[in-house]
Every structure is written in C-alpha cells, then in structure tokens.
Swiss-Prot record:
Function: Involved in ribosome biogenesis; more specifically in 18S rRNA pseudouridylation and in cleavage of pre-rRNA.
Phylogenetic classification of the source organism: Archaea, Methanobacteriati, Methanobacteriota, Stenosarchaea group, Methanomicrobia
Organism: Methanosarcina acetivorans (strain ATCC 35395 / DSM 2834 / JCM 12185 / C2A)
Protein's UniProt keywords contain Phosphoprotein: no
Pfam families documented for this protein: Nop10p
Record gene name: nop10
HAMAP family, alphabetized: Nop10
Protein name per Swiss-Prot or TrEMBL: Ribosome biogenesis protein Nop10
Entry keywords, A to Z: Ribonucleoprotein, Ribosome biogenesis, rRNA processing
One CC-aspect GO term: ribonucleoprotein complex
Any one GO molecular-function label of the UniProt entry: snoRNA binding
Hydrolase in keyword set: no
Length: 51
C-alpha cells in the first residue's frame, strides 16, 4: 500500500486518486497537523470548547 489519502481542493472529499472522481478537481495530500506534547494553543482550544 504505497498510496496515501488525498483531499479534493474544491469539494473537500477524500480519495486516493490524483483527480477528484466527483467534481474533477485537483487533490492534495491530506497531511494531519503535527502532534506536540507541549501544545502551545491547547489552553485556548479548551477554552473555546468550554464555551
């Protein structure tokens, strides 16, 4: 399995193809944000979640 999941730039759907099968748009690698134990924005995210 050498393929990685990709996300369409136009419609936001996920696929393994270079071109979106739904809208025909360009797809980009869907790379998640890097995890850091020393999360500098964790405090703000928890405050926003609390409301």
């Amino acid at each position: 399995m050498g393929q990685k999941i990709r996300k369409c730039k136009n419609c936001g759907r996920y696929t393994l193809r270079e071109k979106c099968p739904v809208c025909g748009g360009v797809t980009l690698p869907a790379i998640p944000a890097r995890f850091s134990p020393q999360d500098p924005y964790g405090k703000y995210r928890r405050l926003a979640k609390k409301g």
